A protein has these predicted regions:
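Cysteine-cluster motifs in flexible loop/terminal segments that predominantly coordinate metals
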Residues: 162-167
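Hydrophobic, aromatic-lined core segments that form the binding pocket/scaffold
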Residues: 2-160
Length: 167
């Protein structure tokens, strides 16, 4: 029996409301954790170029005043703190993305999720989600091939790290 929910989305359609909400929670959770020192400082960038991070903030949190950009040299110093395997982990997620969903928003989620992988807690906690069912919902809808590979009792960080080191 397949664990993947049947898709009712047409290609390019926006995210389901619950997934859009969880994307906002994940991005804000990772940014908050980085600012509080619970994630490495690079996570505050989500590993994105500064103009794209500012776009993420404007699109996901339109009620918030526009964020003043850092000087480029400061932002580049933060990005330089990314772990060496960040891009490989990110690629694993992006290659598993649901092609029916908006590519840009799933890219943002993949960046937030990858940054959260460098925290010390379970992935859902490091992403600022309510519980592991929130993360399972994101994985099921946004990264179905990875959702299918998760074994009962295996946490999501274990799955991602094992896939990274196997591939």
């Amino acid at each position: 029996m397949s664990r993947t929910a049947p898709s009712s989305l047409a290609p390019g359609q926006d995210l389901p409301d619950d997934v859009a909400y969880l994307l906002q929670r994940a991005v804000s959770g990772v940014l908050r954790a980085a600012q509080n020192g619970d994630l490495p400082l690079f996570a505050w960038t989500l590993g994105l170029p500064q103009d794209e991070l500012l776009e993420v903030l404007a699109k996901l949190f339109p009620e918030v005043e526009p964020v003043e950009p850092l000087r480029d040299v400061q932002y580049q110093q933060l990005l330089a703190l990314k772990p060496r395997d960040f891009q490989s982990m990110l690629r694993l997620l992006e290659q598993s993305r649901n092609p029916q969903l908006p590519e840009r928003k799933i890219r943002w989620l993949a960046h937030a999720m990858t940054a959260a992988c460098y925290g010390e807690h379970e992935l859902w906690r490091d992403m600022g989600l309510g519980d592991m069912t929130d993360l399972a919902r994101l994985m099921q809808v946004c990264f179905p091939p990875l959702y299918e590979r998760q074994r009962i009792g295996q946490n999501w960080k274990q799955l991602l790290l094992s896939r990274l080191h196997d591939g």
